[in-house]
Structures are given as C-alpha cells and as structure tokens.
A protein has these predicted regions:
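Conserved alpha-helical scaffold segments that buttress catalytic/binding sites
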Residues: 31-419
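Low-complexity proline/serine/threonine-rich segments in eukaryotic and viral proteins
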Residues: 1-29
Length: 419
C-alpha cells in the first residue's frame, strides 16, 4: 500500500487512446491526408458488426407482433406492432433499464446473465438529497440507448440476457434497516449467478452491497476499486453511517481487506481529515486526478488492477458519478470540480474490467433533481452499458457456470456488530 508511485512511467504496453501514433501512418503529397498502415478503429468496427447475429432482434420483433398486435394496415414497416413492445420508439414503453424484461419473481433472477437492481436510498446523504430518484432517472434516460456499441462491436441483445428486478424496498430515514434490506437483496442476486449491477442511491449503500457479496464468498476475498472524489472512509458522520462512511465498515470485513481498496480520482475540498487518517492507518491505495494524469491512464489502470487483485479472488467496482468533473455531471449530491473527464473514466473502466474478474458494480450519487438535461443519468447509463460490453469482450459474460468464488451457503456473520 505504501509503494511509491512513479510520476513518469515508461511507454505503456497499451497505447493511450489520446496519444498520436505518428509511426503508424504517413501523409500523401497529393491530399496531405493520413493513410493508416493498420486498420482504424472505425474499419474494425464495420467488420465486427458484420459478424454479429440478428437472432435477438428477430425474436423481439416476433414477440412484439404477437403480444402487441400487428400494426395498422397503413404501416409499411411490418415489424412495427400496434402496442410498443420492444426497443422502439425510444420515447415510449415501460422504463426498465434499456427496456429489459422486468422479473417480478426474483427467485428466477439466476436465469439471466445480468440483473439490474435499483437501490433508491438517500438517507445517508449529508448535503443535497435526491439520489433516491437515481434509479428512476437512469432507467428513464437508458431508453435513449440501443443495445449495440459501434466501437466495441458488441450487441448486448444478441450476446447476453439482461433483466431488471426492480428496486430494493428501502426504509426512508433508517439507514440500518435499509442496509439490511440491501445486503439481503444483493446477496440473493449474487448467489444466483447473475451479475449484479446496482443503481444508487447515495454512497452509503457501498457498505451493505459489499456485505451482501461477502456473505457468499466463503473464505474468498474481494478487492474494491472505488471511483470517487471523496475517500468515504469515516467511521461515522453526523453520528450515523452515512455516505461518507462505506469503506470504513466494508474493510472491517475479513473478505474485503483495506490493502485491496483502490481509490481513483480523490481530491479537492470535500475530503474530511478523519477519513484521510483512516486511509493512512489502513493503507488504502489512493490516486488523485493529478497522479493519474502524470502517470498516464495505463499506468494508473495497471496500479489499480495490481492492488485490487493482489491475493483476492474477484473485484467489486463502486463508481461514484462525482469522480467525473462537475461540469459534466451536475446532478449529484456533492459536486467537486477538477475530476476526471468522461473519456478518461471510461478508459480506466475499460482496462480494469477487461483485465480483472469483476463480480459486480454499483453506480451511485446520481441525483436527478439537480441534473440538467439528464446529463448525469446519461453518464451513469454509459458506465453501465460499457461495463456489460467489456464483460462480453473479456469473456466474463455470458457465464457458462457460476464463478468459483461464489459460495452457496450464506455467512451472516461476515461483518462486525455495530451500534
């Protein structure tokens, strides 16, 4: 944890997406336009799309026509039903995440590769509330997205099964009862074998989500990669376990060692000294935005991967939307200028997910009442969709069987009693 961090790393193995590659192309004297000596990302994307199936799309069309009735006689496109029952039109339909099937019977969640879980809890906030509406806001704007990503060559509809199990029933103004609900819900989804994606909610949910994971790890360990501007390591805030406190309590559990907690993007004027003291004493691994910029994105990703996976069996990602510069994500409880650019955060996420055994992710601190034109909710949607794409590209999804780190029997005593 106390390993010095080089400020000038050697040329990374993975070239930065923002670094010019002059050796890979030359200019023609006639047009002065670059001619690439290797396929461009766009060229590769065109070929990847050719290789994707259309099976899922056709199934959606057939089901839409069966359940939603064939369109009126005047409709020339005969894939359009009378009642909207699929992706289109984007402005219509019931707002599950990306219009995924709603699974009312959560006992069947294990039949899917990925489960979206809403956690509408903001009783842990210490300033601006509203994150209880985060799941609604994210789901609503997610209808803007298609299941296909051009650059990645991934079509989620064709390559994985996605469901939305709705929201955990949280208790307003009672963190501890809400935490119990969250831990039970997360443990259920995790143990089923479905990959859990949580829509927060304030960051106080970080503790109960990790507790839910740890209940089904047996003697295995989980590393935590935490994107944030704030350390969130106080024992209490305002006399309770608030959104400034999740990692103090999560790393009290033997399954989630503090030395495997990596905190990316920390900095600014909202980092309480009590939390800094805990980071120092427990040896967490912090990189500021300046560290990341001076090291380079690849060196920062290498650092995060090495620390989070050292002696652990899987990695939990906790993505606080305020790690991104406040100009891009105004709809959050504690906006802090000077954060990561969206493309920087997304690149780090890409490297981390493609190179670690990820067991789940939460996206927290989206507060729609403070948002502008759904910017923040859309950023959260992008993080979630990119996560699923990288899991597909890296071969982690779809799962042929449950990962070996999932322990069938629950251990309800993973955390220390706290009053």
């Amino acid at each position: 944890p106390n390993t010095p961090i080089p400020h000038h790393s050697p040329t990374p193995i993975h070239p930065s997406p923002f670094t010019p590659l002059p050796t890979h192309h030359h200019r023609t004297p006639m047009t002065d336009q670059p001619i690439f000596q290797r396929p461009t990302e766009a060229t590769e994307a065109l070929e990847k799309e050719r290789q994707l199936p259309m099976t899922g799309w056709q199934q959606e069309v057939d089901q839409g026509l069966e359940y939603g009735l064939e369109g009126a006689a005047s409709i020339r496109d005969r894939t359009i039903p009378t009642f909207s029952r699929g992706e289109l039109p984007h402005y219509a339909g019931i707002n599950t995440f990306m219009k995924a099937p709603y699974v009312e019977d959560v006992r069947k969640v294990g039949n899917y590769d990925v489960a979206i879980v809403g956690v509408p809890h903001d009783s842990g906030t210490t300033y601006r509330p509203g994150t209880r509406f985060g799941p609604q806001g994210i789901r609503r704007i997610s209808a803007l997205y298609t299941p296909y990503n051009f650059e990645f060559g991934v079509d989620l509809r064709e390559q994985i099964t996605l469901c939305d199990v709705g929201d955990i029933f949280t208790i307003p103004a009672n963190n501890e009862k809400s935490f119990d609900q969250i831990s039970k819900g997360v443990a259920h989804v995790f143990a089923s074998g479905a990959f859990p994606i949580l829509l927060g909610g304030d960051h106080s949910i970080g503790f109960p989500t990790v507790r839910g994971i740890c209940r089904h790890l047996g003697d295995k360990k989980v590393g935590i990669i935490h994107f944030d501007r704030h350390v969130d390591t106080q024992e209490t805030d305002l006399d309770e376990r608030m959104h400034t406190c999740p990692w103090f309590h999560a790393t009290n559990m033997a399954n989630a060692p503090a030395e495997n907690l990596v905190q990316l993007g920390i900095g600014g004027w909202q980092v309480p000294r009590q939390g800094v003291k805990v980071c120092r004493e427990r040896g967490t691994n912090i990189l500021t935005v300046t560290d990341i910029m001076e090291m380079g994105l690849d060196a920062a990703a290498d650092f995060a991967i090495a620390k989070a996976t050292d002696g652990t069996d899987c990695v939990w990602i906790s993505f606080d939307i305020d790690c991104i510069d406040a100009g891009f994500v105004p709809g959050t409880g504690w906006p802090e200028p000077g954060g990561l650019l969206p493309r920087e955060a997304l690149y780090l996420l890409k490297r981390i997910i493609r190179e670690t055994p990820v067991c789940g992710i939460e996206v927290v601190e989206v507060s729609p009442p403070y948002d502008i034109s759904d910017m923040t909710s859309l950023m959260a949607t992008r993080v979630i969709c990119d996560t699923m794409a990288h899991l597909v590209v890296s071969g982690q999804l779809p799962r042929r069987e449950k990962p070996s780190y999932i322990h069938e029997e629950a251990n309800m005593e993973v955390d220390q009693a706290w009053t």
